[in-house]
Amino acid sequence: MSILADLSSAASSLAADVAHRIVAVRGADGRQLSGFVWSRGLVVTAEEALGGEDEAEVLFADGKVVKATIAGRDPSTDVALLKLDTAEVADWAPSPAVLPASFAVLVGRGESSLIASLSSVSEVGPAWRSMRGGEIDARITLGVRLSARTEGAAVVAPDGSLVGMAVTSPRRRALVIPASTIARAVKTLSEKGYVPRGWLGVMLHPVGQGSGAIVLGVEDGSPAAKAGLLVGDVITTWNGEAVESVGNVANRLAAGSVNSTIKLGVLRGGNASDISVTLGERPRG
């Protein structure tokens, strides 16, 4: 048998081995995407592609359709957690670190069939922060484009371990949310139903030309108020890193920032100083 035939057979077998975990997810508006069983009673799918639904239908490999509730969402990591009745499944081991040019199999599900493709890993980079402030443990992209139905698909390493979940990058390339990032989000969503975000408690406006953010308002009782920030202060640094826009501040108020103490570089009346602030949890509602 040729190398290509061996590779083809191995990829098909791998997709078949994990098929029982792969589901199709259909929102109330009819849009369809993929997901996978994380553990008994829990399915992971792509948060943004799911849309603003409170419940969804989940289609399993045997054709069974089950109503699911949205147990929680984390837009910052693009993870949505669905709660429903599922069979017992073994824990899905996370893959070891993947390498550029290694292979992975993307496995999703349509209404009547499994959807799978073999892809190379085109990029592996360091941890990064999403546009919504989420801490993503590695930048992994695949050399394939996603369809709407394969958003939320599982990305599987050759040994059957889970690389992560496929979501769409700006050019519809498959960007992978790593299994370790998903595990962190699932733990928090299972416990709280949401992912807490850091809270500073200020209204900010850009100063211009990437030179900081000026404080236009301070909420009573907020971490900023307790630390002594005042209207008119210009925040120039955050833990020593330059603040170039209001978005720089917002993105740093991620899930892991709650109860952390940060040092802000501040200009007040032309004088520079440092102010320590212990961040709170952003109020909900």
Name what the model sees in each region.
Residues M1-A5, F103, A116, P158, ...:
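Interdomain regulatory linker/hinge segments that flank or connect interaction modules
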Residues S2-I3, I22-I115, R139-I140, A148-R149, ...:
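Conserved active-site neighborhood of the chymotrypsin/trypsin-like protease fold
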Residues S8-A11, A15, L118, A179-V186, ...:
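Extracytoplasmic/secreted envelope proteins and their assembly/folding machinery
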Residues A19-R21, A80-D91, I115-R172, A179, ...:
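Active-site region of chymotrypsin-like
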Residues R31, T141, R145, T188-R252, ...:
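PDZ/PDZ-like groove recognition
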Residues W38-S39, A157-P158, N239, R268:
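A cytosolic small-molecule/anion-sensing beta-strand core signal
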Residues R40-V43, A157-V163, G232:
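Short, glycine-anchored, charge-dense loop/turn motifs used at functional sites
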Residues E55, S161, T181, P223, ...:
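Residue-level recognition of oxygen-bearing side chains
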